[in-house]
Amino acid sequence: MNAVATAQDGIVFTLDGAIGVATFYIGDSPYAIVTANDQDSVQVIDLRDPSSPVAAGIAVDGERNFTMLERARGVATFTINASIFAIVCGRSDDGVCICEHLPTALFY
């Protein structure tokens, strides 16, 4: 096993307290969605070039109708009629957030 790349919290990525990850595909393109427990957020990462991951979108608790992401933890993805969704646990909100249209629904 070899590490081919890393992504770290900072200017481009919002990953402080990264704790959960799920992957999904749009066509042939792989993506990951990562929960950031300490930043009450989820980050979508474009993995088309595994040696150079690209931030593709973010959702933060309290912004743009995202109200259940405080202390975001677990995440899973699923597909209904070709639409991709993520369900994220918001530990401190005692709830879940269901996000659709990944990654285009999540912006900077």
Set out the residue ranges of the language-model regions.
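Feature marking well-ordered beta-strand scaffolds used for ligand recognition
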Residues: M1-Y108
